[in-house]
Swiss-Prot record:
Family per similarity comment: Belongs to the GILT family.
PANTHER family (UniProt xref): GAMMA-INTERFERON INDUCIBLE LYSOSOMAL THIOL REDUCTASE GILT, GILT-LIKE PROTEIN ZK669.3
Keywords, in A-Z order: Glycoprotein, Secreted, Signal
UniProt GO molecular function: oxidoreductase activity; oxidoreductase activity, acting on a sulfur group of donors, disulfide as acceptor
Keyword Cell division: no
Protein name: GILT-like protein CBG03282
Glycosylated residues, chain numbering: N131
Source organism of this protein record: Caenorhabditis briggsae
Signal peptide per UniProt: 1-22
Gene Ontology cellular component list: extracellular region
Lineage of the species this protein comes from: Eukaryota, Metazoa, Ecdysozoa, Nematoda, Chromadorea
Length: 220
């Protein structure tokens, strides 16, 4: 009886230890990781992150089915208000009017292709372009669900401005303290490390069991 009691205490201790360890390291045991990112169309930091962290991460880990992602083209020092007449929206952006148009174009694409798997390549292509004409020429050439003329018309319309302004609601709900772009939330919490090495950070901290696509655990 003493041996049974001793074994029970021992295995109970191991069970509690595993639970505490799992909580402390924030490992996501088989569940999906939810990532929400906010950025600005002509922000160099956003552009670098999307090109060198966001897109490569998705190409490596998207097939695992473990990542949920959403992007909102709305950053800091950005405001959208109803016009005096009340029939339009007036927006001002951190990097000027051209950025607003790029953000609006991205918002139009996200409306047309609501699934992240569909819109991410196009939104990344638009990101950082000098203007929407250059973005349209570079990003709407291949046969797709998107018509260049329709997207351009949307971007510079009341509807496009309204779509863009709607993304402000997500800032208010999920990132009211946002003071930097890109602003990246993982499972509802902001991690600056996700800006510096998204792929490595996700693999080291959030995805378990670790997919074969992940690099060796060396940092986090």
């Amino acid at each position: 009886m003493t041996i049974i009691r001793t074994l029970f205490v021992y295995y109970s201790f191991l069970f509690i230890l595993v639970l505490c360890s799992s909580k402390d390291t924030e490992v996501n045991n088989g569940e999906k990781v939810n990532i929400v990112a906010f950025g600005e169309g002509r922000c160099s930091d956003t552009s670098f992150w999307m090109k060198w962290h966001w897109l490569p991460m998705w190409r490596m880990l998207g097939s695992t089915g473990r990542i949920n992602f959403e992007y909102h083209p709305y950053g800091i020092k950005t405001t959208c208000v109803d016009s005096d007449s009340g029939d339009d929206v007036v927006c001002e952006c951190h990097h000027g009017a051209r950025e607003c148009l790029l953000n609006q174009l991205q918002a139009c694409v996200i409306e047309a292709l609501p699934n992240f798997e569909e819109y991410m390549e196009v939104v990344t292509c638009i990101q950082g372009k000098q203007n929407i004409s250059m973005a349209a020429e570079a990003c709407f050439n291949e046969p797709s669900k998107l018509e260049r003329a329709k997207m351009m018309s949307c971007a510079d319309s009341r509807h496009g401005r309204k779509l863009f302004s709607d993304h402000e609601n997500f800032v208010a709900q999920m990132a009211p303290e946002m003071d930097w772009a890109p602003w990246i939330l993982i499972n509802g919490k902001r991690y600056k490390e996700a800006e510096e090495d998204l792929w490595q950070f996700l693999c080291d901290r959030f995805i378990d069991p670790r997919p074969i696509h992940c690099p060796k655990k060396i940092i986090y």
